[in-house]
Structures are given as C-alpha cells and as structure tokens.
C-alpha cells in the first residue's frame, strides 16, 4: 500500500480506494462474499472513495476498525522524493546519506534506528498505512475462524490530513448501509499512529479520547488615518496586538480534562490586507488562533473568546484615547477621545449584510466563496469572505468580527456509563494484559490522543447546540460539519502503530510492534468483545 501514492487532494488519492478494494477481494472470504465490500463516494473531482469491508459472523453486534489512506506531500524528501513510496530503496538511500556527513541529533537517532533493522521509512509507512495494514490483517484472521461470533468491519477513508471529508461522508452514509447490511455497530477502534522518541513505552497505547481543535479568528476594522495624524483614526493594529497579547500562549486559556492540560492557544496567522506601501494606517487586520480542547464545548469556547476579545478591544481603545488626550495637551489642541468599539459575531455580520445589501449581497458573497473553494488554505478562504462581508455590510470601525476560521474538530472520549462501554473496556483490559504477557511488553492507557484525527468524527454525534453555533459563525460553508441526524454513536478508542517523525523526511515505523504485536492485540480485543 505504501507503494501506491495517495497524497491528499491528488488523483492518486482518488485512485487508492478502488485499488484497496481490489486488494481486499484477494482474501478468500471476499472472493466468496463480494457484496461484503462497498466503495462509497466521498468528495472531489476525480471522486475519492471510502472503502468498507465487513466479515460476518453470527448476530448483528459489530466492531469497527478505521484508518485513513491519504498521506501528506513528499516535497520534504527533497532529492529522495522519487523514493518516498519505495521503502526498501529509500532505506538504502537514507543509510547512504546519513553515513556520509555530519548529522543533527534527530538524524543520529534515525541512523541508529535504521541500522537496528527495526524501523522502516517511507511516506505513509507510519501515518498511517501500517495501521490500515493491521486492520486488514485482523479482518483476514477473523474471516478464517469457522465459528465467528459477531461481525468485524473495516473503514478506510481519504482526506484525514486536510478536512476529514472521508470519515465525515462515511459517518453520514453509515446508518443506511448498516441497516441494509443488518449490522449494529457498537464500538470502534481508530488505528492512527503515534510518535514516541523513546523506547516505545508511550507509543504502545490505548487512547481513550482525542483532542479537539478550534480555529477562532478576530477580524479587526479600525479607522484609517494619515501616519502624520494618527489620532484622526483608530489603529487596527493596536487592537489586533492587544487581542494577540490577551490570547497568544496564555496558559490561563488552557483547557483541562481527565487530568491532562491542553497547550494554550497560539496564533497561526496575523496580517493586514494591504498589498503595497502607503503612509496610511491599515483599516483592517486579522488574527487567527489554534485552540486545542479537552473538555470545553465549542459554544463555551466561543463565548470565552468573545469575552477575551471584548476586553482586549476595550483596553486598546482606552489606551488610544489616553494617548490622544496626552498628545492633544502637548500640542495645545482638542482631543478626539470618544471612540467606542463593538464586537460582531459572524452570525450578526451576516445579518448586517442582509440588511444593508439584501439577497444580492449574499449572492455576491456566495459567488466569491465558490471561486475560493479550490484553495487548500482555510484561513485564506475565511478572511477573504469576511473582508467581502465587511465591505457589503459597510462596517465601520472600531469593530471586531469573530468566528470560526476552519472545520471544528470535537474532542471525544470513551465513557463508562453504558453496558457496551463497560463491555468494551473489559475486552480492552483483558486483551491488553494478554498481549503484555505474550510479548513481554507493556501497553498503557493514555487519555488524550494529541494528533488531530478522524477520531473526532468516528462514532461521534455532534451536540445540536454546538452545531448551531458553529454553523452560524463559520463564514465558509465548506468548513461546517453538517452531520446526518441519524448518525450512529458508539464508544471509540485509538490503538495504532508507533514510530518517529511522521510527516517528515525520516518518517519511520517501529516494525516489530506494527506488524506483530499490534495485529495480535487488535484481534484479541475483537475476539473478546464480540463473544456473546
């Protein structure tokens, strides 16, 4: 599978799904039961596909395994880019390179890893085709059991590295498919990889939950002025910098959950909208933050962001008014110190657009959104849309518009309340202890999978209130997750391979765990959980 290129957003990604389906059809079970493989449309042109394969046993209870097959681009392989999908040749080339020059510390570790014979390089080898391979191995072994109890289903999806459109489209198609196939999906295992720079003790893990991600933005409209007369306007940059100071790396804004603390919010983009030099202060600036969550809801976070931005706006205007008054006294003139700011949510801005420009203005914005839709940069799409909305609504400053700049990834966690959750937890623990004994190793529980992943949408039904808030305050429709109201909900954990430096030139998987321990461990979970 690694030898089949599948970079996100490319025709190779689109062609991977049908290839994978053909590979699965080589398994004897599927030769006898070809209708137990489905290829379901996801998105794009050419159309990318989700691949679904079920091995049936007795009854309706079903355990789902899930992994993504898209990979990030290969440009960082540089001169070895042509070998990125050829693990054997790449290993030989990397060894030749790493033994020919002075190395950085991470390269010294990579050389030692490769010389040990336990690590295999290649784009997608770690993230995450080795996880998909483990799922296939478990599916095939399950199919070989003559008295199978329950059912085992494998999902292989595209687009995890960009917008999880594969998993989200699968989630929406699954209720009808599960009903047609007569399946009750009662639990799931995401197979994504984790990084471990040590001996694997952290990487050999069962993750009970995954981190959430939000990307709130603040679009600042000031009042421009000639640089020689700064107090005839209001500095948009001052307001933006005060927002930056209030939010950037502020540990008070860290989220907590299950005894763990998320990283603080951090700025991903800060800029104004001018393309050239002027001796005029910019009217509009923009800042966008990556904000990771463990427990706070999107609605609650949005209200907190609004409050923090409002306080920052007040401080900036107060400071500007004080300096305007001080300058006026220095030069013996009257000061303009009556500036007052306001906060608009994206939902409120959209209503202003409708009030000022009517349906025609909304249609012009829709045309712009269609023109921008081919971009893979959510911040570019969002800021251009908000910029147009501000113009259509004739918003004057000082005003700050807030909203969500990209797809919201919910944090999710396996509970312990329902009978199926408890049964799943018991199967996980029994299989964990057996794998530790069988392979003389350790497998630990971890609460939060730190990588943004499909796990946010796997077996998870979004909260209705949160969904409404997100939809109303996300300028670009393509970043609004509109789940099928019949979407299935079930407990999910992440158990996958481990390795080092995924997405990098030296991406590598620890093979003994990925190809020996992991498939056996996963099979043990399935066998115990599906037993009546």
Where are these regions (language model features)?
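Short glycine/serine- and small hydrophobic-enriched flexible loop segments
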Residues: 136-144, 242-249, 523-527
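Midchain, well-structured core segments that form catalytic/ion-binding scaffolds
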Residues: 175-384
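Short, conserved micro-motifs enriched in small and acidic residues
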Residues: 11, 120-133, 230-237, 512-516
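Acidic/His- and Gly-rich active-site-bordering loop/insert found
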Residues: 1-123, 145-150
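Acidic/histidine-rich catalytic neighborhood of metal-dependent amide-processing enzymes
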Residues: 115-209
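An extended, acidic, His-containing surface patch that forms the Zn2+-binding/catalytic region
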Residues: 16-17, 32-37, 325-532
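A glycine-centered beta->alpha junction motif in the catalytic cores
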Residues: 71, 218-225, 293-295, 492-507
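Short glycine/proline-enriched loop/turn "hinge" motifs that connect secondary-structure elements
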Residues: 146-147, 207-213, 277-283, 392-395, ...
């Amino acid at each position: 599978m690694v030898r089949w290129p599948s970079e996100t957003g490319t025709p190779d990604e689109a062609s991977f799904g049908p290839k994978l389906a053909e590979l699965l059809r080589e398994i004897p079970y599927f030769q006898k039961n070809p209708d137990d493989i489905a290829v379901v449309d996801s998105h794009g042109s050419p159309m990318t596909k989700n691949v679904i394969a079920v091995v049936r046993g007795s009854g309706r209870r079903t355990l789902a395994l899930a992994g993504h097959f898209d990979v990030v681009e290969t440009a960082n392989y540089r001169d070895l880019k042509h070998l990125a999908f050829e693990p054997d040749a790449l290993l030989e080339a990397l060894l030749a390179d790493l033994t020919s020059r002075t190395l950085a510390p991470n390269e010294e570790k990579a050389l030692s890893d490769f010389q040990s014979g336990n690590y295999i390089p290649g784009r997608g080898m770690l993230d995450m085709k080795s996880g998909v391979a483990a799922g296939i191995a478990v599916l095939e072994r399950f199919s070989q059991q003559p008295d199978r109890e329950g059912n085992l289903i494998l999902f292989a999806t595209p687009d995890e590295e960009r917008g999880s459109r594969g998993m989200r489209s699968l989630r929406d198609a699954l209720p009808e498919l599960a009903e047609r196939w007569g399946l009750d999906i009662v639990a799931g295992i995401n197979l994504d990889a984790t990084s471990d720079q040590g001996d694997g003790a952290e990487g050999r893990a069962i993750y009970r939950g995954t981190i959430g991600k939000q990307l709130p933005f603040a679009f600042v409209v000031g009042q421009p002025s000639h640089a020689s007369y700064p107090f005839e306007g209001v500095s948009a940059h001052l307001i933006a910098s005060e927002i930056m100071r209030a939010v950037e790396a502020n540990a008070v804004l860290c989220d907590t959950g299950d005894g763990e603390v998320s990283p603080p919010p951090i700025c991903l983009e800060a800029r104004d909208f001018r393309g050239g030099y002027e001796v005029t202060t910019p009217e509009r600036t923009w800042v966008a933050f990556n904000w990771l969550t463990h427990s706070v809801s999107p609605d609650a976070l949005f209200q907190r962001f609004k409050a923090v931005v409002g306080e920052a706006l007040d401080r900036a205007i107060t400071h500007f008014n004080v300096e305007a008054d001080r300058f006026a006294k220095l030069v013996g003139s009257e000061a303009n110190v009556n500036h007052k700011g306001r906060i608009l949510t994206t939902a409120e801005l959209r209503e202003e657009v409708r009030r000022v420009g009517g349906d025609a203005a909304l249609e012009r914005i829709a045309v712009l959104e269609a023109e921008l839709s081919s971009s893979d940069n959510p911040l570019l799409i969002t800021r251009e849309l908000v910029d147009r909305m501000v113009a259509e609504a004739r918003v004057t400053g000082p005003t700050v518009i807030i909203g969500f700049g990209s797809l919201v990834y919910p944090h999710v966690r396996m509970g312990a309340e329902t009978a199926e959750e408890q049964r799943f937890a018991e199967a996980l623990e029994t299989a964990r202890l057996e794998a530790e004994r069988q392979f003389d190793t350790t497998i630990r529980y971890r609460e939060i999978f730190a990588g943004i992943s499909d796990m946010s949408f796997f077996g998870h039904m979004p909260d209705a209130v949160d969904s409404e808030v997100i939809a109303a305050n996300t300028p670009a429709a393509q970043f609004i997750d509109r789940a099928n109201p019949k979407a299935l909900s079930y407990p999910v954990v992440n158990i996958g391979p481990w390795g080092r430096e995924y997405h990098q030139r030296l991406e590598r998987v620890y093979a003994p765990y990925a190809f020996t321990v992991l498939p056996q461990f996963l099979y043990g979970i399935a066998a115990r959980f599906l037993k009546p």
